Amino acid sequence: MTSSILILGQNPGNNPKAYHYKNHTIDRLNKWADLFDVKHYSFINCSDVRGEIKLKDVDFNYVQSTVIGYNKVIALGGFSSAVLSRINIMHFRLPHPSPRNRALNDKAELSRILDECKRYIHE
């Protein structure tokens, strides 16, 4: 069975020139998708607000209505996971793929999490 996958990020980064340069976060996310044998996925952010956001900046109705039709939902980081939990959406929480995320320095733990996510996608 082919899964329809939605990945939920937090919000756009602050750099207005990000679209013109290499985006290490998206590059890492795409490498992970390759590891999961995922060729296509949809992506949305919790909010379009740049910079630091809070739960009040999230359009929960938009997130909830967008999730409909997807059978696998993946949250990037704790904020996105909290948003999905608040609206009772089952999901898998991945660490945020930003190069600034120090949790990714533990290669053994990251490998375990990525293997677990692959199993979630293909179950």
Predicted region positions:
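A polyanion-binding, active-site-adjacent surface
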Residues: M1-I87, H91-R102, A108
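Charged phosphate-binding loop/patch that engages nucleotide di/tri-phosphates or the phosphate backbone
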Residues: E109-E123
